[in-house]
Amino acid sequence: MPDAPKSNSESLKKLYSDMLLIRRFEERAGQLYGMGLIGGFCHLYIGQEAVVVGLMGAAQEGDQQITAYRDHGHMLAMGIDPKAVMAELTGRSTGLSRGKGGSMHMFSSEKKFYGGHGIVGAQVPLGTGLAFANKYRGNKNVCLTYFGDGAANQGQVYESFNMAELWKLPVIYVIENNQYAMLSLIHI
């Protein structure tokens, strides 16, 4: 986890700095993608920076994160080196997954980041499993499990909610409503 700030003023500056880092990183990634220097897909996190930065500000050492394919911002907020993330995006061997995972499939066991996942909602049961492992091991860690509004209607998401409630698992489900999903209405 990133180092905790010492004062409220310092804390606010750190939050702003982290959000700005994510925004500028994503803007550059978008440029490189447009130039054809990033292969495959590149799902940007622009406009959602405050979600992960705010939650990381409350996270404790050892807490895990798992998310979908908009994962660059999560890694940066966890303190993963931006050069390693960019190296992965551009397919270099110095990337987090040795240049093989690209935008959607990065991973850092050292930072407890268990990846971005390309299948909508697939990370939710995995995050629930990480929470089960925390409970089984008796540690005090939680798993922050992020998903978008489009994944909110997937069956495995509701099954995960049910298991988490039945077993009182240490998981926080974070729905990032970026309004990209075509069939997830927030107004009637």
Predicted regions and their residues:
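Active-site flanking residues adjacent to catalytic metal/cofactor-binding acidic residues
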Residues: 148, 175-176
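Charged, compositionally biased N-terminal leader segments and the immediate start
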Residues: 1-13
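Short gly/pro/ser/thr-enriched loop/turn and capping motifs at secondary-structure boundaries
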Residues: 73, 179-182
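Conserved small/polar residues in nucleotide/adenosyl-binding loops
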Residues: 186-188
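Cofactor-binding active-site loop characterized by glycine-rich and histidine/acidic residues
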Residues: 27, 35-167
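A glycine-rich helix N-cap at a beta->alpha junction
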Residues: 167-174
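N-terminal glycine-rich anion-binding loops that anchor highly charged ligand groups
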Residues: 20-33
